[in-house]
Amino acid sequence: MFKYTRFEKARIIGARALQISMGAPVLIDVPPGITPLEAAILEFEKGVIPITVIRPS
């Protein structure tokens, strides 16, 4: 898995949590009653978030 900075990690998880809260499907099985932020963190830990980071070279 790619090593992200803390800023990239925060941006990816925050963006994904917003997507989930707006109705996007969750890409993993989550227990009932979980918040969008917790779901986004679980997705990030499993490496299934469909967001890429492009760094300038």
UniProtKB/Swiss-Prot annotation:
Signal peptide: none annotated. It catalyses: RNA(n) + a ribonucleoside 5'-triphosphate = RNA(n+1) + diphosphate. GO terms for molecular function: DNA binding; DNA-directed RNA polymerase activity. Its EC number is 2.7.7.6. GO terms for cellular component: cytoplasm; DNA-directed RNA polymerase complex. It is found in: Cytoplasm. GO terms for biological process: transcription by RNA polymerase I; transcription by RNA polymerase II; tRNA transcription by RNA polymerase III. Gene3D superfamilies: 3.90.940.10. Keywords: Cytoplasm, DNA-directed RNA polymerase, Nucleotidyltransferase, Transcription, Transferase. Pfam families: RNA_pol_Rpb6. HAMAP family: RNApol_arch_Rpo6 (MF_00192). Belongs to the archaeal Rpo6/eukaryotic RPB6 RNA polymerase subunit family. DNA-dependent RNA polymerase (RNAP) catalyzes the transcription of DNA into RNA using the four ribonucleoside triphosphates as substrates. This is DNA-directed RNA polymerase subunit Rpo6. The lineage of its organism: Archaea, Methanobacteriati, Methanobacteriota, Thermococci, Thermococcales.
